[in-house]
């Protein structure tokens, strides 16, 4: 399972940079996140453009870390 943590402070930008962090053995660089609908809607879709293919993720929850809010996105 792949999960990405996206800083929520960039939520209203047209695109944001997602630095990851995977629990699996994937070598992920910084991916650009394109917001297809409002990010605070749980059904919002995020498309991560990589050098080899396009991968769609769905926002599943919110989390708080060191007083910063993150979007937790899981591969679907």
Predicted regions and their residues:
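Structured alpha/beta or helical-core interaction and ligand-binding surfaces enriched in interleaved
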Residues: 1-57
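Short, compact, well-ordered microdomains
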Residues: 49-76
């Amino acid at each position: 399972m792949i999960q990405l943590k996206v800083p929520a402070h960039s939520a209203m930008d047209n695109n944001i940079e997602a630095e990851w962090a995977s629990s699996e053995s994937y070598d992920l660089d910084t991916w650009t996140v394109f917001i297809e609908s409002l990010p605070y809607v749980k059904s919002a879709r995020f498309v991560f453009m990589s050098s080899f293919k396009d991968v769609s993720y769905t926002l599943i929850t919110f989390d708080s870390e060191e007083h910063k809010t993150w979007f937790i996105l899981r591969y679907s």
